Amino acid sequence: EDINLKYNSKVWTIHPSDIDFRYKVKEATNKALSYTRTAKKLENLKRKSKLILNERHHIALEATYDKDKLDVIIDCIAQQIDREALSATLAIENDGSFKKLPSKDGKELQKDEIKKEIDDIIKNKNIMDLNLPVKTTIPKLKTEDVESVNSILGQFSTAFNNETSRGSNIHVAGESSSDIIIMPQETYSYNNATGPRVLSKGYKYAPVIVGGKYINGEGGGVCQVSTTIYNAALLAGLEIVEVHNHTYLSHYVSGGRDATVAYGYYDLKFKNPYSHPIYIKNIVGDGAITTKIYGCKDDIKRIYVRTEYEYKKQKIIVKTYRVYLDQNNQKIKEELISTNKYDQK
C-alpha cells in the first residue's frame, strides 16, 4: 500500500517497491514451525496440547523496508521544501540615508520526525497518509530589528593627514571595520572586523610603537580608527569589554580616550547592552574619520566623557569616566571606564 506525504497542496507518494517494503513471511513461517520443536521435549508436548485444544499461539507478521532508500527519498523531498531564512538587510550611506530590505522566514522539513512516523505506521501495519512536519525558521535579523535602527546613539571624529601611508591605512581599516550590525548582547571586536592588518590586504608600512619605540610596521595608523570607534561607543552607552591605551599620549585624541590595538594581542571590544541591534558606520574622508553608531531612538543616552590627570616622575596616569545625564542635564551616574598609564617622552 502506498504512503502519501502531504504538505500544503503537494503530495509525494512512496510506493512499497521504492523502499523494498515486504512482510517477513518466511521468518514468521519458520517461527511457527519451530514453535513445537524446542530443545525441551516436555515443553514441546505442552505446546502441542494447547494447539490441539485450539489455544492459539500468535506469531506477528513483521514488516521490513530499506531505511537507506527512505533516507534518500526524504532528503529529496527536503530539497524541494527547505528554504533558508533570509535576514533583513540594512545599509546606511555616508549621507545618513537608510536602505532596508525585509527578512524572510525559512522552512525546514523535520526529517527525523517524519521518518519515525513512517516507521511507526509500517511497524503497526496501519498505512495512512501523513502530513509532513515543516518547521518555520526565523532569520537572525528580522524586519522589525532593522526598522528599530533609526537614530544616532553616538558619534566621534578624529583628523589625520590623508597624504601619507598612515592615512591610506586609516582608509583600509575604516572600511573593513564599518557597516557591521551588532545584535543585542553581542560583542564587537575590532580585530575580528579588520582581520590581520597585513600588506596583502592593502595595508602599507607606517610608524607604529613597538617596545616604546617608533618603527615602520604593517598597518601603522589603524589605532586611530579603533580610537574613533571607541569614543563613539563610549558616547553611545555601549559596554566596554576590552580597551588598552598607547605607550605615549596620542596626537589625535586626548589622554584616556585612545584605544591601541595589536592583532593577536590587544583588541577593542564592546557589547551591545540594548534590546535592539546597533549599526557601526565609519565615514573616512579627506583628512578625517567619523564613526557613527546607529540604534533605536529609545536607547539614546545623554553622555559625556571626562578625564582626570595625575603626573608622576615618569608616568602620566589618566582616569576615564563616563557620565550619564537626565533630561535636565543633571548627573544620574558616573562610571570609571579605565585607568591609563602613559610614559612621558
Regions found by a protein language model. Name each.
Residues 3-106:
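Signal peptide-directed extracytoplasmic domains
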Residues 72, 76, 84-93, 105-106, ...:
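Well-ordered beta-sheet/strand-loop patches within structured domains
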